């Protein structure tokens, strides 16, 4: 369980654990996911200078923490704190490592060339969005690892449950987007257990790699289930191209009442059927009947936009050994409400995972979280101090 609102009911997990970051491209993916979740408008501007600059800078910091002392301080909170140190201290430290020297050359060129306004803009575009994630509770959950994100590992299978908070959607969504992107990379492999990625209210997070996961994960026994209100939400938050890939690559779709473009898109997806039409004309002498055929929508948009509660339309896909003759449906899904109520009556509250009690039984949660927050700040101060002394000695 990952629960940012209540640390008592949350495990701790470091999404950029050094054991699962083998290359600087992993650091870039993590930085990319975080930045685009914090700045949804950047999804439409990928490749722009002031979009790529903060991603490159944060990726360099993450990879530096991965190679410094074998990843001892490679956590997301440490990366945020290091980013917020003076750039006059951070840049010399990062560029003292050969694998990061070329990575940061655009920043060094601006600094050494006196383009201070440009440099300030590049750095601010990284610092400002990430500063929204400076939170002792967030730092607590993301700074240690009580489990790993390879949920379908045959040696350590697990079910991971995470939840967002509508009041803090922009902040938590960025953190959850990072967890999701790391999970996708780890589970979409051969030789793992069957697994499922189930995401409700998908547009609340930017899920990098979602289109690729849908397209390739089936062969690796990963099922993807996505829930959202309307296709237009997906286009708004993922961009037109990526949204179309997601919409067109899913094999099964279930839809309740939707209107507008979404209803038209679904109607087109369900296809057309040859319909017979009979027309009768009556005059004084006789009655004439004509019959013709015409291709009409199998489920027209007007029917989709007028569905009542419990009525669904959709299509399902089959495979070689399990053929489905009737792939398109328009039906009522019957729910056994009594059974649902009985099941809900047996629900158990999320258990206390960390009770934060000292030897005398006193509640010390606030102090423990604050101590962890301050320790991360001290760690980063010490890293900068030691590294500057090393550089001065060289």
Feature names for model-found ranges:
Residues 1-222, 237-238, 302-308, 312-322, ...:
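P-loop NTPase motor domains
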Residues 214-216, 220-316:
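Conserved ATP-driven motor cores of ASCE-family P-loop NTPases powering translocation/secretion/packaging/pilus
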Residues 165-168, 204, 229-232, 259-261, ...:
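Short, glycine-/Ser/Thr-/acidic-enriched flexible segments
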């Amino acid at each position: 369980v990952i629960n940012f609102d209540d640390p008592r009911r949350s495990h701790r997990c470091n999404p950029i654990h050094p054991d699962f970051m083998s290359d600087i491209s992993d650091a870039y993916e993590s930085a990319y996911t975080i930045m685009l979740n914090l700045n949804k408008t950047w999804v439409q501007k990928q490749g722009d200078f002031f979009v790529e600059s903060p991603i490159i800078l944060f990726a360099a910091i993450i990879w530096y923490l991965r190679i410094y002392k074998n990843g001892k301080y490679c956590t997301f909170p440490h990366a945020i704190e290091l980013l917020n140190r003076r750039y006059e201290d951070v840049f010399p430290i990062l560029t003292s490592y050969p694998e990061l020297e070329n990575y940061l050359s655009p920043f060094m060129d601006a600094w050494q060339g006196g383009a201070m306004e440009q440099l300030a803009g590049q750095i601010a575009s990284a610092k400002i969005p990430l500063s929204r994630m400076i939170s002792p509770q967030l730092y607590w959950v993301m700074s240690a690892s009580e489990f790993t994100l390879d949920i379908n590992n045959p040696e350590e299978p697990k079910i991971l449950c995470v939840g967002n908070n509508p009041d803090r959607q922009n902040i938590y969504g960025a953190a959850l987007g990072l967890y999701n992107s790391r999970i996708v990379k780890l589970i979409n492999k051969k030789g793992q257990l069957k697994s499922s990625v189930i995401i409700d209210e998908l547009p609340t997070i930017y899920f990098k790699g979602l289109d690729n996961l849908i397209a390739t994960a089936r062969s690796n026994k990963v099922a993807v289930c996505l829930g959202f209100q309307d296709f237009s939400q997906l286009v708004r938050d993922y961009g037109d191209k990526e949204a179309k890939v997601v919409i067109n690559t899913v094999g099964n779709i279930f839809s309740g009442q939707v209107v507008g473009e979404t209803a038209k898109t679904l109607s087109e997806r369900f296809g057309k059927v040859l319909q017979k039409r009979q027309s009768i004309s009556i005059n004084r002498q006789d009655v004439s009947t004509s019959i013709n055929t015409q291709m009409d929508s199998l489920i027209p948009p007007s029917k989709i936009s007028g569905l009542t509660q419990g009525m669904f339309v959709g299509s399902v896909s089959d495979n070689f050994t399990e053929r489905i003759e009737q792939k398109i449906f328009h039906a009522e899904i019957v729910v056994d409400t009594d059974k649902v109520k009985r099941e809900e009556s047996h629900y158990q509250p999320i258990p206390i995972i960390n009770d934060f009690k000292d030897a005398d039984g006193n509640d010390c949660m606030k102090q423990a979280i604050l101590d962890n927050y301050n320790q991360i700040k001290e760690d980063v101060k010490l890293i900068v101090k030691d590294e500057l002394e090393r550089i001065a000695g060289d």
